[in-house]
A protein has these predicted regions:
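P-loop NTP-binding core
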Residues: 1-258
Length: 258
């Protein structure tokens, strides 16, 4: 059975895309069939896997086919990466979809309808959400079985987390009663600083009794930052690094929770 996980946080710079790439590549290393969905008009996931920005067939194309009720090949947009993970790419043209969806009946279900056509092909579908709570993110959360929330252990992280959790609760109540929280993942973690330790503890104290918080944290490392320009995962770029080890541990936690 295919599991759809949205990686979401309306705050940028929390390693959503890095986590999508490396969780996906790690699941492939564990023998799973995985497709990544770039649901952000910035196209960072697409570029982070080494693909160009000017692709003609993208997530936008697939969603437009759904909206217009056309017959189409749902696999047409899928790109195959050398590490075995598949990708449904995006670029800046997807930004127009956020506005277009407001005029569509059942507008929150367009992405879900498309992904349903792919579920028989994959064990996991990971959606890299845009850093906002607009219509595309609503579509991603409506299509997902669970949401994984990357959080950088900073002072203001708790405010953004509270806002996102309210949105998730609303979507659970109105559109997607099956939506669960996969967990909160601390990213870009620098355990040497007491401030980061205090902020992590504050989030654990506030949310830990109701929401799963991953035991594994993702460190702030040079190698993880450098992978974005190399078009590969941390496993291909520096497989013996702390970053690679941390994402492999995260994969095991996700698999245990499946």
């Amino acid at each position: 059975m295919c599991k759809v996980i949205a990686i979401a946080n309306q705050k940028g710079g929390v390693a959503k895309t890095t986590t999508t790439i490396n969780l996906g590549a790690g699941l492939v290393k564990s023998g799973k069939k995985v497709v990544l969905v770039d649901a952000d008009p910035q196209g960072h996931l697409t570029m982070g896997l080494g693909f160009p920005k000017n692709l003609k067939v993208t997530l936008k194309s697939m969603m437009e086919n759904i909206i217009m009720g056309l017959e189409f090949d749902p696999k047409e947009a899928i790109l195959h990466h050398e590490e075995g993970v598949d990708l449904i790419p995006s670029n800046k043209l997807l930004a127009g979809m956020d506005m277009s969806l407001f005029t569509v009946e059942d507008r929150e279900k367009v992405l879900k309808e498309y992904l349903e056509l792919l579920k028989d092909e994959y064990d996991y579908i990971l959606i890299d959400c845009m850093p906002s709570l607009g219509m595309l993110t609503l579509n991603a959360l409506s299509a997902a079985d669970s949401v994984l929330i990357p959080v950088q252990p900073q002072y203001y992280a708790a405010d953004g987390l509270m806002e996102l959790l309210k949105v998730v609760k609303g979507i659970h109540q109105r559109f997607n009663p099956d939506l669960q929280i996969e967990g909160i993942l601390f990213t870009m973690d620098n355990c040497r600083y007491n401030n980061a330790k205090r902020n992590k503890q504050a989030i654990k104290t506030t949310y830990g009794s109701d929401i799963r918080i991953f035991e594994q944290t993702i460190p702030r490392t040079e190698s993880l930052a450098e992978t974005a320009s190399e078009g590969v995962s941390i496993f291909d770029y520096d497989g013996k690094s702390k970053g690679a080890d941390s994402y492999l541990e995260l994969v095991q936690e996700v698999l245990k929770h499946a």
